[in-house]
Amino acid sequence: MCIRDRAMGAKVIATASSEEKLEICKQEGADEVVLYPRDMDKDKQKELSNNLKAVAPNGIDVIYDIVGGDYAEPSLRAIARNGRYLVIGFTAGIPKMPLNLTLLKECQIVGVFWGQFQGLEPEVNKQNFDDCFKMVTDGKFKPLVSHTYKIEDSV
């Protein structure tokens, strides 16, 4: 995500639960990185929100959230006015968001269900893939390959 988004002109702020993951994010093009704690409480939520605001004082325009849970609200608090919060998944649990923040920030929360999207809008989905592959073939970014496997080891 970092490389693709940078290739499209975005300033990328990556968050992760370990220094090792943040290092990969940096190698993959993140401009800023923020470590988040594995166990969240109210104080840690406030700290995470403050850390995000420190690297993006004017707020974050687009938040791509695959984690959810207790990590969602601090991110929403760091969103820019008229920002977009993309709900991609919720591996840390279904988030509970104070909707008054959407009013105060004049932002949007958008659910992104790629599985359904590719079935309902196959032409747009194909164009998105074509655009990404073109960026790869044009040398704008190189996908991260973390592992390789023999074909015999596949299922």
Labelled PLM ranges:
Residues 92-105:
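Rossmann-fold NAD(P)-binding glycine/threonine-rich loop
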Residues 13, 86, 110:
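Conserved beta-strand positions in the Rossmann-like core of class I SAM-dependent methyltransferases
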Residues 7-71, 124-127:
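Adenosine-nucleotide cofactor-binding segment
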Residues 122-155:
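C-terminal hydrophobic helical "lid"/dimerization subdomain
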Residues 1-3:
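Conserved small/polar residues in nucleotide/adenosyl-binding loops
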Residues 79-80:
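Helix-to-beta-strand junctions that scaffold the AdoMet/dcAdoMet cofactor pocket
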Residues 83:
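Glycine-centered, small-residue-biased loops immediately flanking beta-strands
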